[in-house]
A protein has these predicted regions:
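Short acidic/glycine-rich loops and adjacent helix/strand connectors
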Residues: 1-125
Length: 125
């Protein structure tokens, strides 16, 4: 598929993420980044099987932007909607195939750090 990133430089001068600015930036960037991902993957919306969105944890404003967009898109193209735990997704991304590689299995050590929380996980199955 595709891996696209939208960087929010506006937070640099504050030394951390400002929730209101983050949600506004999400609103501005969500359509362009989805168009870029579809283009990079050389697919169209009709080619996808489902719409996944982050249900949390995360900043409320940014989560609302994501779930609202995902629900609208899901309804408009008649595809199922899947809610995903943000932190679990980072750990489980270990199993995703990327170009030229195969995912490795368990056991492995996972580490997530977000908003002042850190988790070190031993994944055995």
């Amino acid at each position: 598929m595709a891996n696209c990133v939208a960087t929010q430089q506006i937070h640099q001068k504050y030394g951390g993420v400002v929730p209101e600015l983050a949600s506004r930036a999400h609103q501005e960037q969500i359509v362009p980044i989805i168009k870029e991902a579809l283009s990079d993957a050389k697919i169209e919306l009709k080619d996808i099987d489902a719409i996944a969105f982050t249900r949390g944890p995360g900043l409320m404003g940014s989560l609302v932007v994501g779930v609202s967009f995902a629900k609208a898109l899901s309804l408009s193209i008649k595809k199922p909607l899947i809610d995903v735990n943000h932190m679990k997704a980072h750990v489980l991304a270990h199993f995703r195939e990327t170009a030229g590689t195969e995912p490795t299995g368990c056991p492995f050590l996972g580490c997530t750090v977000s908003a002042g929380q850190a988790h070190l996980l031993e994944v055995t199955r």
